Each structure stands twice: as structure tokens, then as C-alpha cells.
Amino acid sequence: MSLSRLLIKDFRNIENADLALSPGFNFLVGANGSGKTSVLEAIYTLGHGRAFRSLQPGRVIRHEQEAFVLHGRLQGEERETSIGLTKDKQGDSKVRIDGTDGHKIAELAHLMPMQLITPEGFTLLNGGPKYRRAFLDWGCFHNEAGFFTAWSNLKRLLKQRNAALRQVSRYEQLRPWDKELIPLAEQISTWRAEYSSAIAQDMADTCQQFLPEFSLTFSFQRGWEKETDYADVLERSFERDRMLTYTAHGPHKADFRIRADGAPVEDTLSRGQLKLLMCALRLAQGEFLTRESGRRCLYLIDDFASELDDARRGLLASRLKATQSQVFVSAISAEHVIDMSDENSKMFTVEKGKITD
């Protein structure tokens, strides 16, 4: 599906906007602080329930307003879907799909698979393991119907287990939690391992095109020792876990490591090369989803020109066009994106929260 229409009310510095969008490329051009990134963030929030620059709802609601409102119209090959999200300063959300309330944020995420590329997105490569777990979990969410429920239950059980660690004195007292936790942990780890294996060749091929000067390898680490039963790990680690008051091993400690010529990419690649790698990984993940499910991603790219020379920008643009996906690109100058434009694209000018085409 593509987003054919977007309505924004009281989001960041945007009071009201009603945008008719292209199913191909949509360009948002304006000076720093004009609101072009806010449009990208509104789209992201409509599909995730949260902004990518702030986790606090009050910070994205326009000054002196009580809530933001986002509406979108998704155009598929056979049907149209109307979606909406309202969130107030307390963080309470209301999700509407096809005119009915009571829906979940996860339903929006399923309807709008999207890939985000921002100047801050280097955390996928040089940040903590949670960012790379999120990369894998995005793929598992869109490829395994039961993943989100299992993942939510895992988070709940880990929170309960960690609280119990402050109160128990013997491992037997933890068994009720571990009886539920162990099969969930093993299932989630299996899904992650299968997904990382399935997408590995796609990532390798795309990364080779973007960074042919490096030999890149990918490895999934599940969060506890190889060839070791998770039940044994939990029992053996009880005293240490009790001292730490948290569960030290498990899928919540998993990682997905990327190396260039045998060394961690964050120690080897320049900022420009890291951005290319990030773009390659996001593209590979989106293309894998399309091939496996027939569904296309939305791509959100903030500050397109940063860190990339003309040749690399051209390569990224050509690969994005080849996906036949809907793409939203922000840039300071139209000169940076004019070569990507065609008869089907739309160019929006953003100035002080006002958007014109």
C-alpha cells in the first residue's frame, strides 16, 4: 500500500496540513527548522504510534495544544484503507481504522511497513545491541504472525522475573516464571536466527553494491551460550541474577554483529561509509519483505544529501526507484533531489510549518 493522502493537525510546528501524495517519490524541501522533518516524523508516528526524535508525546504536540491528530489514506491494488491516530500529552492514544476505534498501534505498523534513514540512524551500527535487535525484530514482526504476541509476553515475563529476583532466596521460587519464559525465549531466538539467515544473502549483495571495497560478514548472537539449553542457563545463573536483580542472559541480550574485513564496522568505516551501509541494510530488508510477502515498504529519508557524494546519492536513488516503493525524501535544496524527480513525483516546499506543492 502507498499513502495517498496525509492530514496533519497540531504536530510539531505544523498547525494544519492536507497533502495529496505520489505513490512514487515525494520531496520535502526547506531550510533547517522549517518543518520538513516533522512531515517525515508525522508519517513515522502514524505507523508506529511514536515519533523518532522524541518519546515524550508532549514534545511533538504543537505549543499550547492538547493533542495531535494524524490521518492517512492507504491505497492498495484492490482496496483503500483509512487510518488515524490521536495522542494527547498524557500519552493516551486512539487508533482508528476504516472508521472504527479501538484498534492497536501494532495494526498500524502492519499496514504501513516502513524504513527510516536519518542522520541519527548510525545507532544501528555503532549503538548498543538494542538497535540491532530492533532491526531483526522488525523483520520477524512482518514475517511471523505470532511474533508480536510472543515478544510482548516475553517483555512482561522478564519484568516480572526481575521483580521476583529481589524477593526470592531459592531458584525453585522462580520456576513458575521460567516455565513460561523458556519456550518463549527459544521461539523468539529461533525466529530471529531464521530471519537473519534468510536475509543474509540479500544484505551481502546490496552491501557489495554500495561498499565493494569491503568484505562484510553478519552474525546473530542469541543472548546465551551456543549449544546450551536456556533452562540450564537460567538455573545456573540464579545467584548472579539475584545479586544483579535482573536476568543477565536471554533473547533480550541478543545482538546482530556486522564486520568489515574482520573488524567491527564502527571501528573501520567512515561516517559516509556507515551511512551507505545503513542505507544498504534498510534497502535489503525492504526488498526482502517485498519478495517474501508481496508488500512494499515506505521509505523515509531525512537530510538526503548529508554524508553522501553525488555518485553515492545517485546509486541510492536508482536502487530506491527499482523497489517501486513510495519514498519520502527531505532536503535543504531542490538541487540535491532534482535528479531523482520524474513525471510521477511530487515536490513540496516547507516553510515555518506551512507546506505547499
Curated annotation (Swiss-Prot):
Q: Which GO terms describe its cellular component?
A: cytoplasm
Q: What's the chief localization of this chain?
A: cytoplasm
Q: Name one GO biological process term.
A: DNA replication
Which key words are in the record? ATP-binding, Cytoplasm, DNA damage, DNA repair, DNA replication, DNA-binding, Nucleotide-binding, SOS response
The record's InterPro entries line, in alphabetical order, gives: DNA-binding_RecF, DNA-binding_RecF_CS, P-loop_NTPase, RecF/RecN/SMC_N, RecF_2
**Do you know which PROSITE patterns this protein is assigned to?**
RECF_1 (PS00617), RECF_2 (PS00618)
Functional note: The RecF protein is involved in DNA metabolism; it is required for DNA replication and normal SOS inducibility. RecF binds preferentially to single-stranded, linear DNA. It also seems to bind ATP.
Q: Which HAMAP family match?
A: RecF
Per the similarity annotation, which family is this?
Belongs to the RecF family.
Q: What is this protein called?
A: DNA replication and repair protein RecF
